[in-house]
Design a protein with these regions (language model features):
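Structural alpha/beta surface segment adjacent to cysteine/selenocysteine redox centers
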Residues: 19-121
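C-terminal cap of thioredoxin/glutaredoxin-like
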Residues: 2-34, 38, 102, 109-112, ...
Length: 166
């Protein structure tokens, strides 16, 4: 029987995507499904759908945002995701790190790149919009930041991210 393949469209700037990333291995083990990670630009997707992020859309509704935070905390507690921290730099411009994800696919270091960037963003509270911080975090994880950042500037990589987003 052919396993179910689930496309996981993600942007590192979404705390919900981080939380999903953390439980995907268990979901895969429980169901036999395979998860295909697809880097996108969430802000671009919101624009294409003529929509806004929940933080922006519900900024004037304090109870809605408070409830969202409460539900997120319930999820974190239920799944034992104690490393999760709200990033003080949120919302973060993720263009560099999302292009980096496509570059990491091309360079065959995608899984480690994804784990590193998610941990940097949502566990270590790093400003992952800053290219110097990005390079330092990748280097600390044993990844070749120079190769990833250089590859992320290639027209093919930029085009793939846009295609993924559409």
């Amino acid at each position: 029987m052919t396993p179910t393949i689930v496309e996981f469209l993600f942007d590192f700037g979404s705390p919900n995507a981080y939380l999903c990333h953390k439980i995907i291995p268990q979901m895969a083990a429980n169901t036999g499904a395979q998860f295909e990670y697809v880097p996108i630009l969430l802000g671009g997707l919101f624009k294409l759908a003529n929509n806004r992020s929940p933080v922006e859309a519900y900024a004037h509704i304090p109870n809605k945002l408070a409830y969202e935070r409460m539900e997120m905390q319930r999820f974190v507690s239920k799944h034992g995701l104690t490393a999760f921290q709200r990033n003080p730099h949120f919302p973060v411009n993720t263009l560099h790190i999302m292009r980096g994800a496509v570059a990491a696919q091309k360079l065959h270091c995608f899984e480690r790149y994804v784990d590193t960037v998610y941990a940097s963003m949502w566990e270590r509270e790093c400003n992952m919009a800053d290219p110097q911080v990005i390079a330092a975090e990748l280097d600390a994880a044993g990844l070749d930041s120079q190769a990833i950042l250089a590859t992320s500037q290639e027209p093919e990589v930029k085009a793939r991210l846009l295609t993924n987003t559409q």
